[in-house]
Design a protein with these regions (language model features):
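N-terminal carbohydrate-binding accessory modules
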Residues: 1-38, 57
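Substrate-binding/catalytic cleft of secreted carbohydrate-active enzymes
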Residues: 33-36, 43-253
Length: 254
């Protein structure tokens, strides 16, 4: 940034708060950013969609860097769509255009991300080309198809796999982990081990912990009257639930 190397000490963030779900007020946004800054976090990934416009204004105000990500994900069907299928090309490009045209003047944004876990193929080559033509000043990112973007991005790679990149014959791109140190339960205990590697060589540029806040809803226990944060199958629906995969945050829902 501005000619100086930047180590990304980042976190992925869903728009969420424990009392109102995905309706996040400006006060909560400010609290999020202040907590991030207090904990030495300097960048946030808008996983996995462009965020409320106010969020970017606050990131500009506080000095928090942003990887802005298009709302493109085909997690459950990435073996089929969009890949090279021309009928999906307009939708893929439309998502890039909507992201860039809305937020291109936000100084906090340092990187455009094509999407998340959405297969590979010609459509992503076209998306990367579109982003570079519209804004050659910012980096491009897409983890599944690293050859078309400016970054060599991975998810949840081990320390040994990170070290292997040092001897990889085509290691010309900056290496980052767009998701790592999955914050589920009693985890993230070996974070210092990761940072020892990241700080050992200039080719490593940090990463984004998964993720910022537990996606849980403030609920009253009908038996005790006490407040607790419910998630997963707490409402009795065991078939259609993410179970504890919704509680991966570094911080609680409140």
């Amino acid at each position: 940034v501005n000619g100086k190397k930047l180590m990304l000490r980042g976190v992925n963030r869903h728009e969420f708060t424990g009392d109102k779900g995905r309706v996040v007020s400006e006060d909560v946004m400010r609290k999020d950013i202040e907590l991030m800054k207090q904990n030495n976090i300097n960048t946030v990934r808008s996983s996995h969609y462009p965020n409320d416009p106010k969020w970017y204004d606050l990131c500009d105000e506080y000095g928090l860097y942003v990887m802005d990500e298009a709302n493109l994900e085909t997690h459950g069907r990435l073996d089929e769509i969009p890949q090279d299928r021309v009928e999906w090309t307009p939708a893929v490009i439309d998502r890039q255009e909507a992201m860039v045209e809305r937020s291109k003047n936000e100084p906090s944004i340092i990187m455009w991300s094509i999407g998340n876990e959405s297969s590979t193929g010609k459509n992503f080559e076209l998306a990367a080309k579109y982003l570079k033509e519209k804004d050659p000043t910012r980096l491009t990112h897409y983890e599944p198809q690293r050859d078309i973007t400016d970054t060599y991005s991975r998810m949840y790679r081990s320390i040994e796999e990170m070290k292997a990149y040092l001897v990889y014959e085509d290691n010309t791109k900056p290496y980052l982990q767009c998701e790592f140190a999955h914050g589920m339960g009693n985890s993230i205990g070996n974070l210092q081990d990761y940072w020892d590697v990241m700080e050992s060589n200039e080719i490593f540029h940090g990463g984004y912990i998964w993720d910022w806040v537990d996606q849980a809803i403030e609920t009253i226990d009908p038996k005790t009257g006490e407040k607790y944060f419910a998630y997963g199958g707490d409402w009795g629906d065991e078939e259609f639930t993410d179970k504890n995969f919704s509680a991966n945050g570094l911080i609680f829902a409140d």
